[in-house]
């Protein structure tokens, strides 16, 4: 992985009671040792693989103002990180779920793009076996489950300030207003809505195949084509490119997909990030609620699975063997 750390700072927020978060600030930057580089590379990998929300700085963003000064050389990185940690503490203190943690600021370069990553990481306890085969307690940074993370694409921010996607952040777990306080800390507002773009793409694909008067099998083949392309982009860490997708769908209609999407006003960007959960709807039907979870291939609808919208009834012809076995054992037992 071609990742180079420019500067990295680490501070700590300690929760003493319900009202107070204590600041512990380093007096020097971290040295980019092999261990530190491995940690940042892992954080970069984990973060890049997660679904993110996109945003942009507001004109009043204090973080953006101080970051701009730091980039211009008017403030050093350590001072910037110390002041920002203080502001983060002030925002976190407003929320009862604030747990504290290690606050990381890392300015790094990956594949010719400069980033500033800000994360609050937790220390977890575990066990290890030492060289004498004794079991001892140990601690580790919980990178895989970090949900208070944001990343600024410094290259995009400085070369294309009108962009709505240079800032990304994790939404956090359901029920926690992680995004709320982090947006306040960053002084940012939500920008590109990747999920809405993906939903718009799905609608455009369905309408495109309908206008081309394709039969059911042909429509599903097109959906599979779209899913395969989008999934390949997702796995490669690349965005969905409408022009490239349109070339994949050449021959489906006399009108290209890009022309169709523009003419019908779907307001799709030329490129946008893939959203895994939304794209899955191209090939699957899935839903859960009220103790029921259903997931099946889209091609089965109308063949083995039938939906009656008038009665909201789903009829399944031919159950999976393992499910059938469970049903038979349960009913034969009189339960």
UniProtKB/Swiss-Prot annotation:
What subcellular compartments does it reside in?
A: Cytoplasm, Nucleoid
**InterPro entries from the xrefs?**
Nucleoid_associated_NdpA
Top-level taxon of the source organism: Bacteria
Q: Cellular component GO terms, alphabetically?
A: bacterial nucleoid; cytoplasm
Question: Which terms in the Gene Ontology molecular function aspect does this entry carry?
Answer: double-stranded DNA binding; single-stranded RNA binding
- Which Pfam family, an example, fits this chain? NA37
Q: Which UniProt keywords apply?
A: Cytoplasm
Family per record:
Belongs to the YejK family.
Q: State the HAMAP family in the record.
A: NdpA (MF_00730)
Listed name of the protein: Nucleoid-associated protein YejK
């Amino acid at each position: 992985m071609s990742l180079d750390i420019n500067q990295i700072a680490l501070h700590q927020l300690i929760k003493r009671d319900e009202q107070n978060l204590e600041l512990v600030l380093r007096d020097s930057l971290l040295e980019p040792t092999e261990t530190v580089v491995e940690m940042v590379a892992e954080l970069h990998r984990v973060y890049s693989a997660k679904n993110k929300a996109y945003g942009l700085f507001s004109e009043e963003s204090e973080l953006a103002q101080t970051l701009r000064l730091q980039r211009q050389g008017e403030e050093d990185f350590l001072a910037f990180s110390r002041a920002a940690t203080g502001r983060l503490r002030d925002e976190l203190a407003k929320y009862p779920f604030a747990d504290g943690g290690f606050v990381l600021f890392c300015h790094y370069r990956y594949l010719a793009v400069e980033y500033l990553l800000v994360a609050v990481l937790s220390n977890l306890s575990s066990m290890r076996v030492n060289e004498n085969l004794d079991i001892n307690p140990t601690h580790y940074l919980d990178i895989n489950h970090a949900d208070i993370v944001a990343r600024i694409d410094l290259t995009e921010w400085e070369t294309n300030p009108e962009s709505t996607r240079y800032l990304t952040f994790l939404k956090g777990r359901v029920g926690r207003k992680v995004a709320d306080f982090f947006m306040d800390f960053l002084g940012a507002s939500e920008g590109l809505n990747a999920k809405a773009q993906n939903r718009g793409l799905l609608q455009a694909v369905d309408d495109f195949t309908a206008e081309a008067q394709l039969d059911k099998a042909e429509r599903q083949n097109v959906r599979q084509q779209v899913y395969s392309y989008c999934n390949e982009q997702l796995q490669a860490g690349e965005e969905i490119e409408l022009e490239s997708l349109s070339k994949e769908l050449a021959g489906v209609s006399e009108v290209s997909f890009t022309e169709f999407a523009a003419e019908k006003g779907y307001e799709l960007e030329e490129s946008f990030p893939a959203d895994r959960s939304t794209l899955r709807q191209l090939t699957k039907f899935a839903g859960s609620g009220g103790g029921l979870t259903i997931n099946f291939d889209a091609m089965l609808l109308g063949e083995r699975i039938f939906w009656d919208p008038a009665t909201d009834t789903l009829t399944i012809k031919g159950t999976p063997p393992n499910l059938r076995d469970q049903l038979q054992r349960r009913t034969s037992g009189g339960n």
